[in-house]
C-alpha cells in the first residue's frame, strides 16, 4: 500500500505499513482519500530533523503550532508503537502528537535517523520515492526562527495506490 503526496516541490511516494499499524494506517489513508491533506502547507521545517504538515485549512489553527487536527473518528487515538518500526533513516513517516495517545491527523517526515523519537511517535510509513529529490528541496527551504518555511509550499493532492479501505464502511 502506498500514497503519493503531490507537493509544490515535487512528489513524495510513501509506503504505508497497513499490517503493522492498522488503526494509524486506516486513519491516514481515509484522510488522504477524503482530500483532507489537499492544499495544506508544511508548517514546520527543521533541516537535519524533520518536516511537518500543517492543518490550518481544517482546524482553524492560525498559530501554525501543529497542535490541531482530528482523526477520522473525530478525536485523538492511541499510539501503535512497534519495536520493529524505528526512526532509523531519512524518510520515516510518523504521527505528530502532543504526548502519549494523542494522535490526530498531523504527521511528519524525518530528514535523518532519529532514534530518540522511537517509542514516542507512531511510525506508519517510509518514503520510497522522492527522498533524494523532493525532500532535499524541502530541507533547503529557508526558515524563520520558529522553523516556519519562508517560502510556502503545499501538498496539492494525494494519490492512493491500491486502497484496502475503499470497500470498508467508514
UniProtKB/Swiss-Prot annotation:
Keywords: Isomerase, Rotamase. It catalyses: [protein]-peptidylproline (omega=180) = [protein]-peptidylproline (omega=0). It comes from the Eukaryota. One of its GO terms (molecular function) is peptidyl-prolyl cis-trans isomerase activity. PROSITE patterns: CSA_PPIASE_2. GO terms for cellular component: catalytic step 2 spliceosome. Pfam families: Pro_isomerase (PF00160). Its EC number is 5.2.1.8. Residues 1-160 form the PPIase cyclophilin-type domain. CDD domains: Cyclophilin_PPIL3_like (cd01928). PPIases accelerate the folding of proteins. It catalyzes the cis-trans isomerization of proline imidic peptide bonds in oligopeptides. Belongs to the cyclophilin-type PPIase family. PPIL3 subfamily. This is Peptidyl-prolyl cis-trans isomerase-like 3.
Amino acid at each position: 500500500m502506498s500514497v503519493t503526496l503531490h507537493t509544490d516541490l515535487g512528489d513524495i511516494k510513501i509506503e504505508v505499513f497497513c499490517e503493522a499499524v492498522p488503526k494509524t494506517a486506516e486513519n491516514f489513508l481515509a484522510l488522504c482519500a477524503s482530500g483532507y491533506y489537499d492544499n495544506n502547507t508544511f508548517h514546520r521545517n527543521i533541516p537535519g530533523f524533520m518536516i511537518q504538515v500543517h492543518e490550518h485549512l481544517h482546524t482553524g489553527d492560525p498559530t501554525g503550532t501543529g497542535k490541531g487536527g482530528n482523526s477520522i473518528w473525530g478525536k485523538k487515538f492511541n499510539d501503535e508503537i512497534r519495536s520493529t518500526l524505528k526512526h532509523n533513516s531519512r524518510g520515516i513517516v510518523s504521527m505528530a502528537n502532543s504526548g502519549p495517545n494523542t494522535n490526530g491527523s498531523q504527521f511528519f517526515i524525518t530528514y535523518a535517523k532519529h532514534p530518540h523519537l522511537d517509542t514516542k511517535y507512531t511510525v506508519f510509513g517510509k518514503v520510497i520515492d522522492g527522498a533524494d529529490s523532493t525532500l532535499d528541496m524541502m530541507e533547503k527551504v529557508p526558515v524563520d526562527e520558529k522553523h516556519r518555511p519562508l517560502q510556502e509550499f503545499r501538498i496539492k493532492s494525494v494519490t492512493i495506490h491500491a486502497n484496502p479501505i475503499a470497500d470498508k464502511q467508514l
